[in-house]
């Protein structure tokens, strides 16, 4: 190292930063920051996985391996490797581990030194240390590797040779304290890798220079857009130190390490080290944190006081040219892969025999803040009471909310039940409506079938016998005037026949008055056909009445003995007459039962409030029924009269 540069670095008050700056200079000079721990292990331990870790190596062999190491580093890195880098590195390693000049070095300390000065993150270096020094079990299982107290002591002792080569020596006492803190609470003889990494990341004092050197290398090109409050430099390049007590107070790296401060800022204030550029949000949070620190604190930072006292004790062991260093520092560095860095104090509290009582000045400062602490505690109790009150109110509101929610759920369930009932009723009513409509259609079909002309299965003898029985016997036997028969046939109330013109005119009047055609009305052709069928028996009757003289002549020519009808023939006629009367009574009953159904069907189709239209429609349908009955009478009367006429003519002949 250049003596002038070394003299400049010796003016740094804090020993940790002084050691880190010196090692950073050596690292840059030898270009060791271009290496990585994986490549170092691959070159130095190539083909020696089964050999002992205590293997020695000569200086010539070490030089060849260093040349190969830098050659492979230059191939994988864009930076140009200096030709003298292997020589400088060999000289550095010999100054560390071969002070007697024997020319023989151990591989394990050499590899640990190269890993410590490489460019990897601290966590990667800690893993490499464990792999180099951990003792494996008899089966050679790497997952069961352990680090014992003896191995950890050897590791820390070898790593202590690195700051010693730059004039920063450490005693053996911090090593024993570090071992005690690492194995605190451990009952076994060794620890696993997770426990070792957790302890190393807590930054023990003996290894504090290693993460500090990494932060210095990471912040060399970082620019902070703030102005130094001491030298007024803008922007700050490198490390930035922000006071957590003073408002908007930033110090550059040079002013902080030189011990330059303003009157408003004291050295006892806690400062935070920034290795990366902070965003506007983080700066705002930092400002609020400073405001919070200016308020009365809950308790005295005894841990910070102890760390400050520890730094004073360490500074007293330095050379006489260095003054006492007092620092309480927090830092923020970039998170390297696998390395979880947090804001914490750079100097951790020492354990074991180094834990002594602080100075009387610090105790007086503690007494001055005693009353303030008591007041803050009282205020804290009042705040807790208020918080408990708020919690009780919160529980009450939650109970009310739960009660209202239950009521709402009950109302919702009731509404759902009512909706289900209504839907069931709607379905039932719809089903009933469909059934009624089906019944109505069936009744319409039945009515249409009954209004059709009578099928041949119905016997016409019933009506004929009834008509024949209703005639006066004396008129037939005496051959009286047939006008009586004609009157009974045409003037009877149930056998009244209408002319074709009257029926057609009445049908047209009904259709014009109702405004719509009847759905079940028969066509006009069927009505005319039925009218023609009615005229046929009328013509036959007129022919019978038109020839009374011939009939009388035939009657006068019959002898008295032949006019008498036998008693057997009369008894058979009476039986036929009684059967016909029974059938007529059954037909009358069927017609009387059909009439109410017909009226009900008409009532279902008729809309409310339209009584005239309903009357006209009912009148039209009644006409259809009358016409159908007329057709039925015509079909029955004609064959009956023909049969009776043949019966009457038989005895006469």
From Swiss-Prot:
Primary location class: membrane
InterPro entries recorded: EF-hand-dom_pair, EF-hand_dom_typ1, EF-hand_dom_typ2, KCMF1/Dystrophin, Znf_ZZ, Znf_ZZ_sf
Keyword Membrane belongs to the record: yes
Amino acids binding Zn(2+) 2: 243, 246, 265, 269
Cellular component, GO annotation: plasma membrane
Positions bound to Zn(2+) 1: 228, 231, 252, 255
Molecular-function GO terms, alphabetical: zinc ion binding
Keywords assigned by UniProt, alphabetized: Cell membrane, Coiled coil, Membrane, Metal-binding, Zinc, Zinc-finger
Location in the cell: Cell membrane
Residues in ZZ-type zinc fingers: 223-279
Protein name, as recorded: Dystrotelin
Organism: Mus musculus
Gene: Dytn
